[in-house]
Amino acid sequence: MSSSITTPEGIINPPIDELLEATDSKYSLVIYAAKRARQINAYYSQLGEGLLEYVGPLVDTHVHEKPLSIALREINAGLLTSEAIEGPAQ
């Protein structure tokens, strides 16, 4: 029996080289993805409470897919924008 259901590929897809095109550095990518993953996790947590403060996943997700994998796929698809935070004025 063959299955046409695609399985999530986790952290290996999308490739790091493609993800780095969306940010300035690996550090920026990590922060960017972590913040979005926290938003996705908070969205799933608040679903049962009826609150809709956060935006849910912008890509199709799989049942057991981790928020970080979802965030990386959103970044790779160009669905998110980031803004640089300026440091304190000197």
Swiss-Prot record:
Q: Which SUPFAM superfamilies match?
A: RPB6/omega subunit-like (SSF63562)
Keywords assigned by UniProt, alphabetized: DNA-directed RNA polymerase, Nucleotidyltransferase, Transcription, Transferase
Q: Which Pfam families match?
A: RNA_pol_Rpb6
Q: Which reaction does it catalyse?
A: RNA(n) + a ribonucleoside 5'-triphosphate = RNA(n+1) + diphosphate
Coiled-coil residues:
none
InterPro entries associated with the record: DNA-dir_RNA_pol_omega, Pol_omega/Rpo6/RPB6, RPB6/omega-like_sf
In UniProt terms, what function does this protein have?
A: Promotes RNA polymerase assembly. Latches the N- and C-terminal regions of the beta' subunit thereby facilitating its interaction with the beta and alpha subunits.
Enumerate the PANTHER family for this protein: DNA-DIRECTED RNA POLYMERASE SUBUNIT OMEGA (PTHR34476:SF1)
Recorded protein name is DNA-directed RNA polymerase subunit omega
Q: Which organism is it from?
A: Streptomyces griseus subsp. griseus (strain JCM 4626 / CBS 651.72 / NBRC 13350 / KCC S-0626 / ISP 5235)
Gene that this sequence comes from: rpoZ
